[in-house]
């Protein structure tokens, strides 16, 4: 059975390294919603063997790891290296996070009842 990659890895343009862009995007999601984010990524290489589904082509993907956890403002609290396997954890004061969300007013003008279906 074919399994597609489920993490960020090799680039379509070989001279590009999107790791820092990926981190900044995730930090932005955290900051814009005032919630901590746990961003997990694989490490190592995954080889794609020739099969009918890929027209007999082989390739490989190199995953750049670099998993991290942000606080509610998007600041990285703890991170891992590109080849580092393991676990990381962080503790947050949930009451303080809720207070921060309420005091910033980021959600005040959102109107979810007006959102249409995506699909």
Predicted features, each with a name:
Residues 1-87:
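CN hydrolase (nitrilase-like) catalytic-core segments centered on the catalytic cysteine
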Residues 42, 97-119:
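Cysteine/selenocysteine-centered motifs that mediate thiol-based redox chemistry or coordinate metal-sulfur cofactors
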Residues 52, 89, 109-111:
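A generic membrane alpha-helix/interface feature
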Residues 84-102:
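A short, polar/charged loop-to-alpha-helix boundary motif
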